[in-house]
Amino acid sequence: NNTDITNIEDMLSLIEKTNNKENISITYMRGTKENTTNLKLSKTEDNVYKTGLYVKDSITGVGTLTFIDPNTKLFGALGHEIIEKNTGQRLEIKDGKIYGSSVTGITRSDIGKPGEKNAKYDSSKVFGTVSENTSSGIFGKYTTDIPDKKLFAVAKEENVKTGKASILTVIDGNTIESFDINILRINNNGNSTKNILFEINDEKLLKDTGGIVQGMSGSPIIQDDYIIGAVTHVVVDDPSKGYGIFITKMLEEAEN
């Protein structure tokens, strides 16, 4: 009936209201192409109509907030795009939110098997709205009071160098900790999210996590008291190593 559907509840409601429950016409987007087809419904013993479609209208995940601009309250997180695992496509965000969360445990990384942060989030603690999901991270507006934390100057790409640095991340509860890393290589490829190759040489972090784990994406990389980038990927064959994106790329994307 030419009604736009934005969630599963709307879809089920319209199916119940339609007169012809044998076949319904639907229009959908695949990439940039619009398609129309007929959908055959099946009625269960409980008088519930099934479409045979796999449909979901939301996705959740654990990641790390990289920065908040104190002047504009724009924020950036993750340092890479969110991919829908079933389609392999970048997820289009229309009404995203970031929430306060607490790390409850760590599944350690091992060679060939990345670990992850286990966390719980409080849906009543909305910290901001997400408006963009890009190759450089997710971006939006921080809507609560900015925490009274240390401000970092931003390093230019040409000032990032190999050698000592650190990452800021949470591995227990809400406590932000600094862990030592060593930057091995710099890649100035303009389109890459792997500008910085580093290894962890912090014994505590290696002991507790086995290296980089999922959920650390977005963790700020600090060098000489400047923010230089954010963690983006783990080296699967050696989880003590990881990649990061230049912070300047994330800031440029946020401003756009």
Question: What are the residue ranges of the model-derived segments?
Answer:
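Serine endopeptidase catalytic core focused on the charge-relay Asp
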Residues: S42-G210, Q214, Q223-D224, T232, ...
